[in-house]
Amino acid sequence: MDLPKAYDPKSVEPKWAEKWAKNPFVANPKSGKPPFVIFMPPPNVTGSLHMGHALDNSLQDALIRYKRMRGFEAVWLPGTDHAGIATQVVVERLLLKEGKTRHDLGREKFLERVWQWKEESGGTILKQLKRLGASADWSREAFTMDEKRSRAVRYAFSRYYHEGLAYRAPRLVNWCPRCETTLSDLEVETEPTPGKLYTLRYEVEGGGFIEIATVRPETVFADQAIAVHPEDERYRHLLGKRARIPLTEVWIPILADPAVEKDFGTGALKVTPAHDPLDYEIGERHGLKPVSVINLEGRMEGERVPEALRGLDRFEARRKAVELFREAGHLVKEEDYTIALATCSRCGTPIEYAIFPQWWLRMRPLAEEVLKGLRRGDIAFVPERWKKVNMDWLENVKDWNISRQLWWGHQIPAWYCEDCQAVNVPRPERYLEDPTSCEACGSPRLKRDEDVFDTWFSSALWPLSTLGWPEETEDLKAFYPGDVLVTGYDILFLWVSRMEVSGYHFMGERPFKTVLLHGLVLDEKGQKMSKSKGNVIDPLEMVERYGADALRFALIYLATGGQDIRLDLRWLEMARNFANKLYNAARFVLLSREGFQAKEDTPTLADRFMRSRLSRGVEEITALYEALDLAQAAREVYELVWSEFCDWYLEAAKPALKAGNAHTLRTLEEVLAVLLKLLHPMMPFLTSELYQALTGKEELALEAWPEPGGRDEEAERAFEALKQAVTAVRALKAEAGLPPAQEVRVYLEGETAPVEENLEVFRFLSRADLLPERPAKALVKAMPRVTARMPLEGLLDVEEWRRRQEKRLKELLALAERSQRKLASPGFREKAPKEVVEAEEARLKENLEQAERIREALSQIG
């Protein structure tokens, strides 16, 4: 046997990771096997592995390995995303260290630098995924800006444009002054933030004033109206009049609009169409022309802006404007207020709003194609609740702003004629050809749009482009649609819904059959991990400390029902201990072979039990994999390996092995081989190593998934009675304070035949012998099928034992009383953190239960 005494993941995992990277599991579209396809959510090319990636890819790899073993042509398509904003920001930071900006280099040279950076550093995250054991088809690795994916993007846009679904129009958009680009609503994060609410007084035409409340006093100078609710009697007499913007000579109308909230502030709303989405909608309804006073750099500008504020940053301008309003008597009050601060999800900068031409995609007709499919039940969701969430979003979807003011990304294939201003987009049949003259007037003076597509535009094509679309490739014919998409619920709208749109529109069918949505990985307190909080758990550090198998297994084990995961390091310790337990069990089996001399070949009760229990386990675990309930599958495997195999069968097999029973050794080997197969999708490294040592076969990943054998319910029932008898004896020893190895004598009642027929195994497991008659005084432990009675005479000083128990009982009751007093205090429950209160409740429960057990034991001895 060549397994070292102790398991060291560092000596095993890199070896297998390198082997799988060099010899990837390449799919064959002509194999004739039924396909099973997963599209890997492409991580950002800028990225390093974080816990979300680790969870996401552990689940995918478990599924792909399972299906590969089930005989499917399992295809896991990997790749990375060019991550427009994120990548551009990374490279711009590198340039800043050289004292340069992208504008110093110019677009062409800057893009050369980005590609250079991508080639040098962009493969980091895929290398890290390989270290985690990801068995993707690395021969099909894709990048959202490689040649094939670029062709798909150009073709998709050409189709959308010539079908009237892509159009260019000026609208209010989210703008990040730091990243210098527009953002979709889904790329904006809103957080409650302490701020101020200012009440300002506007002079009304003909005398009097009207007061408005705002959190953005610096935008007052862009006001185009004051709106009140049509049913608000307080302002009915002012409708149709005008009000003067403070510190200016600009007069604006007072009008009625149902969007105004009567109960917010004063009930009168300043309408600033250029700087607020709601105001923009009100302005559209009333024909108000937007006026902007904040430029794209976030600075104040415009004729309406007082000289003292021009050129100031918007936040500095806010402070200064409030001073000016106060001095001029326009500030009525200033109060603390929690504002909903909208920030860029990439850099955290508070966004601004701006109006300028952008490319848009008409989502309503596209969403309707998807909704028809979802109503037919084309796509299953796990958990099912997300289907309604997906449909609700599609039913209320707005047009998608698909252009970004970046340099890194897919440059939009649209050209503007400098003579007649016509837009030129290549037609689908010539989508790769750049136009040389204007389709409208024939002029050769064409200028290409400088904007790039939103990163999610190319990501939305992922299930198609990874298979070679728009070319009619063998992969596309064989592997579309995909089977399961595994991703986090946080990108359901950003990515999943948009892939549905692409699939139904371009292929006429769903892009995948099932969507498995998992939660976020949070810290042990349920908080999001962030560098600023200092609570980030680095998966690579965890791999170094516990092993990749342990990390994978812990994450899968915790991924129940799509809920967020609170990751406590104790779960990683649990998984590492599980790996060690399995390793030691395998060493025992291999050691048992050495020098074994067969003297008999008879199935024991334990052998029959283990084979039957394994058969049930195979059936249950297979069903859980099929239902995509990997967390429960992990728990079932854990129970089967740790409890049934290691704790019970392995121990019960020792007397038979000692007696030279070949059937028992064969059962150990065969059961272990099946357990390694069941666990392989979740813990591929350790199981591959042990399977090779056990069977001599090179690649467990290519072995067949086990089929359930026959059930032996009689053996399962009999062995369960034996287990209960042993458990009862062990509990009695613990109750009496005796060491587990202490030899005792017990009297059994109930289903005792299995014990009597397997007395040697019972004695070995319990270190107990049977009494022929029921003792008068004894500690009693009742189990569902067996009751055990253990007299204390001759084992210990009964009176001394009684004194110790009574003393402990008093201590426990005192502790329980202290907890009850603390929990009864309103101050404690109101002020103490929730986890502190829960811990105190758990202490009280445990102490009361222990006290009850001691009372019962004392009453039994008399």
Curated annotation (Swiss-Prot):
Effect of T272A: Decrease in posttransfer editing activity. No change in aminoacylation activity
CDD domains: Anticodon_Ia_Val, ValRS_core
Root EC class: ligase
Protein name listed in UniProt: Valine--tRNA ligase
Motif 'HIGH' region location, chain numbering: 44-53
Motif ('KMSKS' region): 528-532
Subcellular location: Cytoplasm
Family label: Belongs to the class-I aminoacyl-tRNA synthetase family. ValS type 1 subfamily.
Entry annotated with the keyword Protein biosynthesis: yes
Coiled coil: 802-862
Positions contributing to L-valine binding: P42, N44, D81
Annotated InterPro entries: aa-tRNA-synth_I_CS (IPR001412), aa-tRNA-synth_Ia (IPR002300), Anticodon_Ia_Val (IPR033705), M/V/L/I-tRNA-synth_anticd-bd (IPR013155), Rossmann-like_a/b/a_fold (IPR014729), tRNA-bd_arm (IPR010978), tRNAsynth_Ia_anticodon-bd (IPR009080), Val-tRNA_synth_C_sf (IPR037118)
Subunit structure: Monomer.
Binding site for Zn(2+) 1: C176, C179, C344, C347
Gene: valS
Cofactor needs: Zn(2+)
Cofactor, free-text remark: Binds 2 Zn(2+) ions per subunit.
Organism lineage string: Bacteria, Thermotogati, Deinococcota, Deinococci, Thermales
Positions bound to ATP: K531
Domain notes: ValRS has two distinct active sites: one for aminoacylation and one for editing. The misactivated threonine is translocated from the active site to the editing site.
Mutation effect (F264A): Decrease in posttransfer editing activity. No change in aminoacylation activity
Alphabetized HAMAP family for the sequence: Val_tRNA_synth_type1
Job of this protein: Catalyzes the attachment of valine to tRNA(Val). As ValRS can inadvertently accommodate and process structurally similar amino acids such as threonine, to avoid such errors, it has a 'posttransfer' editing activity that hydrolyzes mischarged Thr-tRNA(Val) in a tRNA-dependent manner.
Claim: Magnesium is one of the keywords in the record: no
